Structure formats: structure tokens, C-alpha cells
């Protein structure tokens, strides 16, 4: 894909219950082609339009999106922090994506379930994104899926590495070229 940076994106279907990932769950669109329709009631579609603006919401028409996935919860929409005071305070490995009004894209990945990092809460993710000026932001899949790769090398420590040295197969990702 010739990317310099990437983070995991949507959740995955785990029909056998073994947590290996690999099959996307929910809406998936890549380079203008819809690969899967939306499935989850109340989940948000998170994606970029042709002008690289991050869109987050429950859309029936996704024709304006170039790339997108489906997950929840939205953290910030139109500058409003939706998770402040929500009680979503359990600490886990987390991944989030956001965008400032000037177009700057933000990617947040926090390790968890490890001695060097217990994780972070959804509320804290919202606070961090807000503190960096996110106008739109959403959670992506977390837990053992949370990973950031820079120049082909993992720069975070996914919890799956303790269970499987090859890590978890991810169904999709947001990439920076």
C-alpha cells in the first residue's frame, strides 16, 4: 500500500470465537468502492470524503465517502465532546481517529493490559482529542487490535503479541501515504 503510517480501524467478525480477526464487521469502503454495507444499529460510519474531510455519523447515503469503516462511539462531532461525563471509564488499549477544522488528521493509539500501560478510557480519549483541537473524532476498534505501524514497523505493543508473535490479522486500517 506504500503507506508510511497506519492504524487499525473497524472491528472484526469472530464467528469461531478465537479472536484472530481478519474479517471486517460493518460498513467498509475503500477507494470509492463499497465492500460491505452498514450493519450495526447505533454504530457510526467513520470515513473520509474526496476532499479528505473526516465524516462521522449514521449515514444512509455514503456516496460522498471515499474510504470508511463502522465503529462506535463517536467522541467529538462538530467540536462537541460527546463522551465527557459519560461514565465510559474502563481502561483498555484504544485506537481513535480525529480531524481538526484546518484538516489536520490525528491518530491516537494507546497500549494497554501491559505493565508499561494499563490502557486509557473512552472519556480520556475524548479529552485528548479535544485538547489537540479535534473537530471530529471517533473511537476505532481497541483491545488486542490496537496498533500503530510506522514505516513497516509496529511502534506500539499490541496485547496479542504476548499470545501470538505474529499478532492479529486486521480487516482494515487507516493509512497515511
Residue spans of the language-model regions?
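Gly/Ser/Thr/Pro-rich low-complexity, intrinsically disordered segments
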Residues: 1-177
Amino acid at each position: 500500500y506504500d503507506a508510511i503510517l497506519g492504524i487499525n480501524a473497524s472491528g472484526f467478525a469472530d464467528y469461531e470465537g478465537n479472536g484472530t480477526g481478519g474479517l471486517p464487521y460493518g460498513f467498509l469502503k475503500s477507494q470509492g468502492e463499497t465492500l460491505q454495507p452498514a450493519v450495526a444499529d447505533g454504530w457510526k460510519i467513520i470515513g473520509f470524503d474526496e476532499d479528505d474531510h473526516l465524516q462521522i455519523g449514521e449515514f444512509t447515503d455514503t456516496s460522498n465517502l471515499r474510504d470508511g469503516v463502522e465503529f462506535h462511539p463517536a467522541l467529538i462531532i462538530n467540536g462537541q465532546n460527546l463522551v465527557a461525563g459519560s461514565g465510559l471509564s474502563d481502561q483498555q488499549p484504544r485506537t481513535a481517529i480525529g480531524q481538526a477544522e484546518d484538516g489536520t488528521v490525528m491518530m491516537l493509539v494507546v497500549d494497554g493490559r501491559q505493565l508499561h500501560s494499563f490502557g486509557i478510557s473512552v472519556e480520556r480519549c475524548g479529552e485528548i482529542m479535544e485538547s489537540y483541537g479535534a473537530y471530529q473524532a471517533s473511537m476505532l476498534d481497541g483491545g488486542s487490535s490496537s496498533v500503530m505501524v510506522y514505516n513497516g514497523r509496529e511502534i506500539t505493543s499490541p496485547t496479542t503479541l504476548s499470545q501470538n508473535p505474529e499478532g492479529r490479522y486486521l480487516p482494515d486500517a487507516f493509512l497515511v501515504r
